[in-house]
Amino acid sequence: PTDRYFTNVAWAPDEKTIYMIELNRDQTDGELVEYDAKTGKKIRTLFAEHDDKYFEPCAPIQFLPWDSSKFIYLSRRDGYNHIYLSNTDGKLLKQLTKGEWEVFDIIGFNKSAKSVIYSSNEASPIQKNICTVGMNGKHSVIGNATGWHSAKLSNSGEYILDYYSSPTIARNIDVC
């Protein structure tokens, strides 16, 4: 038995290692840990996060399709759920999104633009928009800004089916 909770497992692009968040029983401390996929042996801890009340890892890390030495992850380390960029040495490279709003989820990547597609309530607390952020931190809303949006990406991430509605718009689907 263990006093740890394991969650958000992700494979490395080369499939030789796996990454997971290990939480203490109180769920106030979490560590991103790398393991050898064949032996199950712990290789190293990349970083740790702490919250006095509750640490909630929301999603596994996601490696950049154009650079397998870097990954993104969601964290509330600044008080809001945002996207962070790190490398496989555990170094935090950049906070990609910032502000008094929440990133709901990472939808995928636009490989040619080297950007992340995500959903957030940046425009309004009562909206959910589809947004993009580049590795330089520059971000923008995709498509119609009003309403509640969900998205389906093409394989390349260059095209998006934007499903949305609002109090004045019945369900609509746009190609962006």
Task: Describe each model-derived feature in a short phrase.
Residues P1-C176:
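Peripheral, non-catalytic segments that deliver or gate enzyme domains
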